[in-house]
Regions:
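Catalytic center-proximal scaffold of phosphoryl-transfer enzymes
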Residues: 1-179
Length: 179
């Protein structure tokens, strides 16, 4: 990825003179041609029984001179290894519903971090919410100061799961063979 202003500068440096607005329009038209593919891929993700979501901040748009606004990509991953990156200007809870909708396959599971928007969405959509092990492990790690014995036991069990995952990766297992 290279911002349009840098692409424009490289073209100009190479003796190719085009306007920056034309370059922007060309990019927008190209993205428009890809929209049906994006929509089909997103529909496949929404139909997945298991899907994962996370939000990640980016700087986009000017908040004031010299300062950029924070916006968010919300990568969504489906069980057929599809990924889409919906964009929203904030981290508000309703963006989860806007991205995933409320119609789900029976037994659907949403895998995410501990952000409360995901748990609220799962409850509203009547699906199972599962946290990723890295975030779950962090809670037990922090609990060692309060409940050292129980936290250590939980961390040991999570470590065993990590060992199973390492074995799966080392053996390059896929699909049902992972089970």
């Amino acid at each position: 990825h290279l911002p349009f202003y840098r692409q424009h500068q490289r073209l100009t440096d190479s003796g190719i003179n085009v306007s920056r607005p034309w370059l922007t329009q060309l990019g927008q038209q190209g993205a428009g041609l890809l929209e049906p593919i994006y929509d089909a891929q997103f529909a496949s993700i929404r139909a997945s029984r298991v899907k994962a979501i996370d939000e990640t901040p980016i700087k986009a748009g000017r908040a004031s001179p010299g300062k950029m606004k924070t916006a968010y990509f919300w990568p969504v991953y489906g069980e057929l290894d599809e990924v889409c990156f919906p964009f929203f200007e904030s981290r508000r809870h309703e963006h989860v519903e806007a991205a995933l909708g409320l119609t789900h396959t029976e037994g659907a599971v949403l895998l995410s971090d501990g952000y409360s928007a995901y748990a609220q969405y799962a409850e509203k959509a009547k699906i199972t919410h599962a946290q990723c092990w890295a975030h779950t492990r962090r809670g037990f790690y922090e609990a060692q100061a309060v409940e050292p014995k129980a936290a250590a036991q939980a961390l040991e069990l999570i470590g065993e799961l990590y060992e199973v995952e390492a074995h799966i990766r080392a053996q390059q297992l896929s699909g049902a063979r992972k089970l």
